[in-house]
UniProtKB/Swiss-Prot annotation:
Protein's UniProt keywords contain Metal-binding: yes
UniProt: Fe cation 2 binding residues: 63, 78, 82, 119, 124
Protein name, as recorded: Bacteriohemerythrin
Keyword set includes Zinc-finger: no
Assembly and interaction partners: Monomer.
UniProt: Fe cation 1 binding residues: 19, 59, 63, 124
InterPro entries linked to this entry: Bacteriohemerythrin-like, Haemerythrin_Fe_BS, Hemerythrin, Hemerythrin-like, Hemerythrin-like_sf, Hemerythrin_metal-bd
Organism per entry: Clostridium acetobutylicum (strain ATCC 824 / DSM 792 / JCM 1419 / IAM 19013 / LMG 5710 / NBRC 13948 / NRRL B-527 / VKM B-1787 / 2291 / W)
Amino acid sequence: MFVWKDEFELGIDKIDNEHRKLFEIANKGYELLKNEFYVDKYDKIMDIIVELKEYAEFHFSEEEDYLASIGYKKLFTHKLEHDSFIKKVESFNIKEIDYDQDKYIQEMLDFVVTWIKEHILEKDREYID
């Protein structure tokens, strides 16, 4: 399970709440990974990927609007980071899911959680300092 920690707080309620939601989506993947009652997880994996992509696009748009409103000088670079995340999610090879569903979920979660944590702790922290 992926736990929200105080160190992820930026002090901007709207952004912090949206970041928490990204953790919640990742936790759906974790719960699916640990659920031994689903023999075929393909549809659930696809649901999580779609939700992750759609919510990330929403969040990134909101965050970029906020950054524009405060005149953040590194907005373009920050947007490129967001774009790379979306491209990676879009590149998840859905044909590979069926070969080893749990392995696929784990690899997907490793990428998503690492990216989100690093992005919040490094890139997002830059605009509040």
